[in-house]
A protein has these predicted regions:
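Local sequence-structure signature of Cys/Sec-based thiol-disulfide redox active-site neighborhoods
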Residues: 33-48
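Stable alpha-helical elements in mature extracytoplasmic
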Residues: 42, 49, 66, 98-102
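N-terminal secretory signal peptides and thylakoid transit peptides that target proteins
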Residues: 2-19
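Thiol/selenol-based redox catalytic cores and closely related redox-interacting motifs
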Residues: 76-157
Length: 157
């Protein structure tokens, strides 16, 4: 019975294959979209919205500095204002926008300022905790254009 000796070349090929196998899951994993959020340090519903985003595949950095100045800098008209403002993938997010619609926005890439859920409707993400019971008010997610006009991107009833 003859055995062939393990050569240096075989060892290097085996090591390269093992390295590729171990690295493959990390190389193919999709990066979590990064969201920056500006909010009041005392706002509980903003924290709950951030938790909603994180649970739905986003990486979030929060700034407890308020959001009025950032809202204007991102081009989101005041009329669509809410308690927090965010930025993701070059878009502005205003208010309690569901993660589902943020993912859709990033996939569709419309020419727009971003999405807004004005006013803080009960039942929207972050406004859906036990303190609200089972109450769910209808609301619209608006696609805000660069000219300040908006259209319904998704209705929640």
């Amino acid at each position: 019975m003859t055995h062939s000796p393990i050569t240096r070349r075989h060892s290097l090929l085996a090591l390269a294959g093992l390295t590729a196998l171990v690295a493959a899951p990390h190389g193919f994993a999709a990066a979590r979209p990064h969201v920056e959020v500006w909010k009041s340090p005392s706002c509980g519903c903003c924290k709950d919205w951030i938790t909603h985003l994180e649970a739905n595949g986003f990486e979030v950095t929060a700034f407890d500095t308020g959001n009025t100045d950032v809202r204007a800098q991102l081009g989101m008209p005041q009329q669509y204002g809410s308690c927090h403002t965010a930025r993701v993938g070059g878009y502005a997010l205003e208010g309690h926008v569901p993660a589902r619609e943020v993912h859709r926005l990033l996939k569709e890439k419309p020419s727009a300022v971003g999405l807004a859920v004005p006013a803080m409707p009960v039942g929207s993400p972050g406004m859906d905790g036990p303190e609200y019971g089972s109450r769910k008010d209808p609301y619209d997610v608006l696609l805000v254009q660069r000219d300040g006009k908006a259209s319904v991107y998704q209705a929640y009833r």
